Amino acid sequence: MVIIMEKPWVEKYRPKTLDDIVGQDEIVKRLKKYVEKKSMPHLLFSGPPGVGKCLTGDTKVIVNGEIREIGEVIEEISNGKFGVTLTNNLKVLGIDEDGKIREFDVQYVYKDKTNTLIKIKTKMGRELKVTTYHPLLINHKNGEIKWEKAENLKVGDKLATPRYILFNESDYNEELAEWLGYFIGDGHADKESNKITFTNGDEKLRKRFAELTEKLFKDAKIKERIHKDRTPDIYVNSKEAVEFIDKLGLRGKKADKVRIPKEIMRSDALRAFLRAYFDCDGGIEKHSIVLSTASKEMAEDLVYALLRFGIIAKLREKVNKNNNKVYYHIVISNSSNLRTFLDNIGFSQERKLKKLLEIIKDENPNLDVITIDKEKIRYIRDRLKVKLTRDIEKDNWSYNKCRKITQELLKEIYYRLEELKEIEKALEENILIDWDEVAERRKEIAEKTGIRSDRILEYIRGKRKPSLKNYIKIANTLGKNIEKIIDAMRIFAKKYSSYAEIGKMLNMWNSSIKIYLESNTQEIEKLEEIRKTELKLVKEILNDEKLIDSIGYVLFLASNEIYWDEIVEIEQLNGEFTIYDLHVPRYHNFIGGNLPTILHNTTAALCLARDLFGENWRDNFLELNASVSKDTPILVKIDGKVKRTTFEELDKIYFETNDENEMYKKVDNLEVLTVDENFRVRWRKVSTIIRHKVDKILRIKFEGGYIELTGNHSIMMLDENGLVAKKASDIKVGDCFLSFVANIEGEKDRLDLKEFEPKDITSRVKIINDFDIDEDTAWMLGLYVAEGAVGFKGKTSGQVIYTLGSHEHDLINKLNDIVDKKGFSKYENFTGSGFDRKRLSAKQIRILNTQLARFVEENFYDGNGRRARNKRIPDIIFELKENLRVEFLKGLADGDSSGNWREVVRISSKSDNLLIDTVWLARISGIESSIFENEARLIWKGGMKWKKSNLLPAEPIIKMIKKLENKINGNWRYILRHQLYEGKKRVSKDKIKQILEMVNVEKLSDKEKEVYDLLKKLSKTELYALVVKEIEIIDYNDFVYDVSVPNNEMFFAGNVPILLHNSDERGIDVIRTKVKDFARTKPIGDVPFKIIFLDESDALTADAQNALRRTMEKYSDVCRFILSCLTGDAKITLPDEREIKIEDFIKMFEERKLKHVLNRNGEDLVLAGVKFNSKIVNHKVYRLVLESGREIEATGDHKFLTRDGWKEVYELKEDDEVLVYPALEGVGFEVDERRIIGLNEFYEFLTNYEIKLGYKPLGKAKSYKELITRDKEKILSRVLELSDKYSKSEIRRKIEEEFGIKISLTTIKNLINGKIDGFALKYVRKIKELGWDEITYDDEKAGIFARLLGFIIGDGHLSKSKEGRILITATINELEGIKKDLEKLGIKASNIIEKDIEHKLDGREIKGKTSFIYINNKAFYLLLNFWGVEIGNKTINGYNIPKWIKYGNKFVKREFLRGLFGADGTKPYIKKYNINGIKLGIRVENISKDKTLEFFEEVKKMLEEFEVESYIKVSKIDNKNLTELIVKANNKNYLKYLSRISYAYEKDNFARLVGEYLRIKEAYKDIILKEIAENALKEADGEKSLRELARKYNVPVDFIINQLKGKDIGLPRNFMTFEEFLKEKVVDGKYVSERIIKKECIGYRDVYDITCHKDPSFIANGFVSHNCNYPSKIIPPIQSRCAVFRFSPLKKEDIAKKLKEIAEKEGLNLTESGLEAIIYVSEGDMRKAINVLQTAAALSDVIDDEIVYKVSSRARPEEVKKMMELALDGKFMEARDLLYKLMVEWGMSGEDILNQMFREINSLDIDERKKVELADAIGETDFRIVEGANERIQLSALLAKMALMGR
């Protein structure tokens, strides 16, 4: 019985309530807390709950050219509705990317509510009320300019405001505006009558007012009145004037309600209005123009109005003491502002005008300044070598100075960029010339250059190298301008780089680079290397993102129109507020506020569901998923049948509608081509097809084809680590795509034509239901595609017609033979050409078979007709065996192509589909093919120009080979000379194989072996490279598609197949359907939220995660997420025990400067870091204080480690205990890029060392061999100069004459070739090889060097042996730690050696054992000596602290001290309460006493940097001086030493525990006892006895008595001893369990967290802290948006319960054996179990173990176990037969069998050792199978090995 499958049961039986979730008690418990609190709103939230980035309703904004309140505008548009409302007729002002003011369209408006606002006040009088998350453009104190959330703003930050604003122009009577200005300033309209008075003491103004009144109002009666005791006025009686005033609402008392009419604000008449108003109410005070008004609205209007003219005004509030009223003062300051006022508005009064001119002279630049990001300016200076003025050192620049400096700087930048582009252009051309061409033109070149012909022949044969001058002459003759290239190289080296930088990259000396560039060198190959290096450096500069960003910053400074207004006050407001916002696409800002301010708008995170947006939904959902266009060709298998199709055709097959909501479709019968781990092309199953619509796509053209896809779709490319995905938008011309040529297996050699059988069958009709295909018939079908047609007479008589040229005798004969052989009836005739019917130029062969004709008609055409342009290659052909496919192509080529088979064949066609079919068919048949201009090409030969299938991208291959460089026996660079020196972008696989044969495989390290294996796979891969030629954006507006290939993420598609990256079906499932559907439904009951589980989210691909993020943004009004984190002040510990605040760590982690932390696992890799505000997740922050005084702040759901496991802060109470790791403190991580080894100084040291060894300088040496290295370099330089003019013998003679030394011809030859040896050079090179020259002070290795150095000074010895042996004597544990440190530096030490010893100490005989190691590493030996470690007896020669330690950072000083005290310091010890002391002791001879004292003084100073006090003591013992440095004896001093420095190696762990005991002891005295004492004193009032108080506080009675007497607090006798501490408090020997003495809630805070790789923990403030709850592979945007719960595998009983429930509901008989089998194969995965059950139910109602194992392709565990037991019993043949049964009858893969064998190991009755051997053997077999070995052979070999093992 077959059951028709409905909805997948995984979805049908998904848990509906928290109680339905089985086996996850901890998670359910946590989620139920949220239900109880009802505090978590709807869904997964990607922003603060219920709050957008919004403003209050009274915020002013310029919309459509007028100033209005934002609330009023949005209420009109939305009709009071909350949420999003679309609009298309609203315009606002904002700034573009250059900081210029522009007008933008608003896409939608937004209304919401919030409980919290931030109120901001600025120096210029601005006042804003915004939500906490509203971003504002800020100029920070460090000069950085960025959008900052309001809650993060600080007083002193500067807010971006516009320098001018624009209004839509409107007409207004200028004289009426002027008259109104006068009236508002000094006029009054009577409330009851038609009287108006204008009161002003200036006669000129009164006269002007009267003139304007008479002109504007015809009924006006005007009279001037001069009063004795008050100011004169103009009296007006005019009904018209009063009606005009009444309309403006200004009749009667008007002082606090005046405003600038909007019509005037938008018109040119504004100028006249302002002049009149300022004439009346404006004045000059000190250095400013000031105007006072009682109307706040008028004051704010004036600021906006003045900005129309670029005048920046300040608004200031003042309370009038006489009437206690608030007045608003408009203040215009700064000479540039005042001058703008004068030029655009001015005064009419002479008196005010004169004062204005006077104050304009006084410049005050401090009012209009910007804080400069000096780092960006300096970066430009350093990168482009630009000279800057001293102003760069100033933090603040005035606006005018800023524009002037940056505009000048831009000119210099542009000049240098142009010069660099010219240099780049010159360096693009290689220096090397074609010596074959030189050979051909030798005679001509000799004549033109004057170089002897025989000399040129020597150059050609390589017997002599030409000098640069001669080389240039030859190159010029060949038309190659080498001189231009050399000049460019010299300019770049001197101007933009340095000889040192270039030399370092090429591993050459600075002087060598100078010689090659400046001299007449013969080393042309070296010049070519320099050219390539310089070209790389030029490109790095021109493509430097940081430089581009910095130049953009300068461009912004030079062109912006922003005034930076300093914030002076920030206040949080609580209550219920309605908030509003506008959405401006692309620029996301607009100008608004009480005074004009640049504000940010909402982003797509505040969009509602698609139905609200209608046709505009895609504006915010453009890149929902990365996809390819609908007509992209792809080869697929559907139900096992191969089909060359397009995504558009797949859409028709799988999608039911054209509805955009139907975005994905799960499939189980679809396969695509992809690549496996060995880079072999394979079929893989598709789980999901995805589609969505986009407006635009990219078209990328490459060699032989093109692909169309969205910009965020990734294409697979090759880099040095293998295959990587790169976004299409990041692809550049010249990049290499990957295609394939492979032999894909095919099985068919027969066609089933039964469906085409004629209805009326007679004896004359040949029936061919089973049509066998051999090579002949395959060729015949291929020929049909080229030359065939089909015809029918009526419905039954069909013919297959071949038309061939009458001259094509071979084809005609071959076709006739095949037709005859197959027994077909045929008919032949001649036919005319299309131009001349009479000329019978072609012959037709007609196969008379209706069945064959119907088959051809149905399969060889696209369904749109039977013309040539409709032809296709039938899908069945793609399934034929490989040899048959090749013959089909041969037939196609013979009929319609040019060229030669097995060389290059061109096949022309009018059918694009046919050409694409041909290319795909050829490629799966092992033939390279491409498409060019209406033809398909099949390619076997023709060099790189034609044949590409043997080529791979050169750059990653070269990088891989360089990693093996030291293990290659031969000149691999010569093999790849074209790629290295001529810029060839690809390399052949044959050359890779050739180089691999030269590799010494046995000497490869593990990492090198990985590279070698990768290269080996690539040398055999079926992939090859195609170069990108062109990229363009095209309009599209249609569906795009993607497929999900589980566990592979790749597929081939395109008209020429290209390897693409795919999506992930789980992410799509969550994104497209569940989130959308879930978000649209309301919560049931009174619970205000729902929860989504994002299970196994670490399996999501980056594409799927990005799509999830976008969907979350889309529904962000109903989303929330859960995280648990620490506040930013928490200090986390790095592996080398430096501290760093967690917020700083995350910044450095993002910059990839720090990647590891210390946790329970030791050193662990950080995979993710996140920051957010704890209010987002509704978790308040708590402060925990421990008995040691340690503190930490964390969210309530953050976990800390306790004796009983992890516990949330919510669960922890006072007196509970948490575990602490006593990490060192006091040394923070700081970036310090100084090098610890100065190579120049080291070289100088080596030179002096050479002299000690007997080498001599020039003047003293008799031969070249005796010379010091430095003088050998001088000889080299001179030899290179002479090499162009003289023979080797002549050079030798001249060198001997000039330098007075003997030198051999062999040495001369080596020097000419640039080869130089020397002691100093050898060890400098060794230092470089080990990478020690790159070590900086902030590198962990700097600490290792310092630690070792300290220990070696104490207990090490540099012997006087030639090989440079170092001896270190210590305990075995110490030596093991030292060896680990040495290994990290690349130094190998001997095994640990133990010896018996006997010696006398202080007159006593001592016997025992000593242990030591020795190190034979001359480079390390010399480096130690260079750093001051004496060779021989240190006690005689004395001790030194190296300069790099002395002047280093605290990190290297601490490590040096740890090493020194670890060697010679006393181990701290406590008995009961008291420590025995810490000191450093060294016995020295009298001769080195003073030097040792100096050394100890320096150590003492170093200790003082850690606030550790010490003193020095010297005493005589046995004629030696015991010099001791003693740490002062007090607990606080000891604690500082033990917690900040401690010891290296063995003494360290115990010392930390001593330190933690002291910390608890001191905290008890300083914190706990102090509090007890204060409380006891308060209560000691006679009511309670002293004994009662002592019992209450658990202290002795005498402690209370001492407090009453005022004595110092002592430690009570009942305080734990150190022995008790070790027993009761120490856990696992390294953690301390400490009591929480205080827990307090401190509200919401910004919090941080990190995710580690190996262990979910990290050390923070000493606490062992749990890391993020979400998985390690989630991208940061998801981490910051998503609630992720980690589900553990379910228990058997949990799965069984659920399966029984489902079986009962579905009417299935689930047997016990069937249940056990499902549990076994599902491995704790409920979804897998349900899927197996549903699959089994499709075959039978009775589900037993047999059917379960059959549908899951798994063997019974007892079968596998039996096979293993047979093998172990030595019954190999029986075991092998059972293996074959599993593989053949059960259809199991080798990998599945191995997995089951691995699971059965524990159940075998064999000893532990054999189990280990067996696990190792299974692992080895698995590796070999993965590498491509035959499964059956490998598994048989494994059974054979087990048979031998069993003996």
From Swiss-Prot:
Keywords carried by this UniProt record: ATP-binding, Autocatalytic cleavage, DNA replication, Nucleotide-binding, Protein splicing, Repeat
Molecular function GO labels: ATP binding; DNA binding; endonuclease activity
InterPro entries: Cro/C1-type_HTH (IPR001387), DNA_pol3_clamp-load_cplx_C (IPR008921), DNA_Rep/Repair_Clamp_Loader (IPR050238), Hint_dom_C (IPR003586), Hint_dom_N (IPR003587), Hint_dom_sf (IPR036844), Homing_endonucl (IPR027434), INTEIN (IPR006142)
Intrachain S-S bonds: none
Record PTM text: This protein undergoes a protein self splicing that involves a post-translational excision of the intervening region (intein) followed by peptide ligation.
Any GO CC annotation of this UniProt entry: DNA replication factor C complex
UniProt GO BP: DNA repair; DNA-templated DNA replication; intein-mediated protein splicing
CDD domains for the chain: Hint (cd00081), HLD_clamp_RFC (cd18140), HTH_XRE (cd00093)
Domain DOD-type homing endonuclease: from-to ranges: 179-311, 780-927, 1348-1508
Pfam family membership, one: RCF1-5-like_lid
Extra facts: The intein interrupts the potential ATP-binding site.
Subunit structure: Heteromultimer composed of small subunits (RfcS) and large subunits (RfcL).
Homology family: Belongs to the activator 1 small subunits family. RfcS subfamily.
Role summary: Part of the RFC clamp loader complex which loads the PCNA sliding clamp onto DNA.
PANTHER family: REPLICATION FACTOR C / DNA POLYMERASE III GAMMA-TAU SUBUNIT, REPLICATION FACTOR C SUBUNIT 4
Protein's UniProt name: Replication factor C small subunit
Species assigned in the record: Methanocaldococcus jannaschii (strain ATCC 43067 / DSM 2661 / JAL-1 / JCM 10045 / NBRC 100440)
Gene name of this polypeptide: rfcS
